[in-house]
Amino acid sequence: MDTETIASAVLNEEQLSLDLIEAQYALMNTRDQSNAKSLVILVSGIELAGKGEAVKQLREWVDPRFLYVKADPPHLFNLKQPFWQPYTRFVPAEGQIMVWFGNWYGDLLATAMHASKPLDDTLFDEYVSNMRAFEQDLKNNNVDVLKVWFDLSWKSLQKRLDDMDPSEVHWHKLHGLDWRNKKQYDTLQKLRTRFTDDWQIIDGEDEDLRNHNFAQAILTALRHCPEHEKKAALKWQQAPIPDILTQFEVPQAEDANYKSELKKLTKQVADAMRCDDRKVVIAFEGMDAAGKGGAIKRIVKKLDPREYEIHTIAAPEKYELRRPYLWRFWSKLQSDDITIFDRTWYGRVLVERVEGFATEVEWQRAYAEINRFEKNLSSSQTVLIKFWLAIDKDEQAARFKARESTPHKRFKITEEDWRNRDKWDDYLKAAADMFAHTDTSYAPWYIISTNDKQQARIEVLRAILKQLKADRDTD
């Protein structure tokens, strides 16, 4: 290469670096703005095609303080986890760039190539469809996704293996694949063509061109982050409000059998959940003072604290608002045992809808996003049990007043609780739509009238036993 050509190449690299840094800072400046975005870069490809070198070069061209890289070898799918679960904790906040060097597509290929029970074509394509739907949900929630496949011909791969330093011979069978095996190479290439039609394909033959093309693809993505799904709100058809939300029986006098029945059921529930090899997620929603805390207390009464996690959900923190609204729930589903939510992801279609924190387009879209989320859980050996605890307005007022006059319960009542009563009917309408759009065979709603606290607690425990048995019978 002559001096003039070298000088031109250096100049081009300097300009590319400057362009990348400017685009990087432009993205950072969208944080907390109406046009806020983040970028996820999924990197996969043939080994020795230069993925690692391209990522290292990218770090030299951008401001490395604000480029995040998560690098993991592919692993087989865990049947008790949705495909996205190992990664969602690392979803970037607004203004951030995250490279996932190793991602769910690598896991899909590893599973298809190595699992003792190979994936058939239908299941493989179902995974791809679910992955694309998840990526679209990310995009709709301001996380753009760039997918890059580094390719390399069989001939070039073999030459690079021949030229390798003996100390790096472990690459020969990296990730369990024998890269000297032409049949395995061909199988991998055939499989990846079933999902890379919407990927940027980078030819790994020429090192300089490879690095430049990778950086250029990222620059293009940063400069042209699309406005995803900015659709007009639908003409909304309000669902009818179920009678159980408005018609309540007068609470009965204390049942003489209540304590013995409660004792029996708490033990049965503990035994059933403890002996079940699936994960159990129990979700509570309902009006304030409807008895969510009391019901949860009875559910865990016979369990050891090490067997369960309880998450009490309040208004999101600022760092949570900078990510998709489901992110703070994805990150709370790490337990392999029992997880209980005192308020849930349904805040998107309840309080965020009623109080105007979510736009009409956002809360209308959320029903489908939530259904996909719950379907992913259900398909990953998780029993999802959802409760709405219903109470009438007069009983709620009586419980509020009782809290105010009880020293150890005063902390449970605030001015906001009283103010929310002004929007009672709006919350009922939101709840009715929620039931209409998210009551599914894999995650049904149990609506429990709680004017009678004792009867409500019994019904909650019975419903848990019923759902555990129903899901087991359909497995």
UniProtKB/Swiss-Prot annotation:
Its cofactor is Mg(2+). Its EC number is 2.7.4.33. It catalyses: [phosphate](n) + ADP = [phosphate](n+1) + AMP. Optimum pH is 6.5-8.5. Optimum pH is 8.0-9.0. Residues 18-222 are annotated as: PPK2 1. One of its GO terms (molecular function) is kinase activity. Lower concentrations of MgCl(2) are required to obtain optimum polyP synthetic activity, whereas higher concentrations of MgCl(2) are necessary for optimum PAP activity. It comes from the Bacteria. It is an enzyme of class 2 (transferase). Residues 256-472 are annotated as: PPK2 2. Optimum temperature is 50 degrees Celsius. Keywords: Kinase, Magnesium, Repeat, Transferase. InterPro entries: P-loop_NTPase, PPK2-related. It holds the Pfam family PPK2. Homodimer and homotetramer. Uses inorganic polyphosphate (polyP) as a donor to convert AMP to ADP. Can also use GMP, UMP, CMP, TMP or deoxyribonucleoside monophosphates, with lower efficiency. Cannot use low-molecular weight polyP as donors. Can also catalyze the synthesis of polyP from ADP or GDP, with lower efficiency. Belongs to the polyphosphate kinase 2 (PPK2) family. Class II subfamily. This is Polyphosphate:AMP phosphotransferase. The gene is pap.
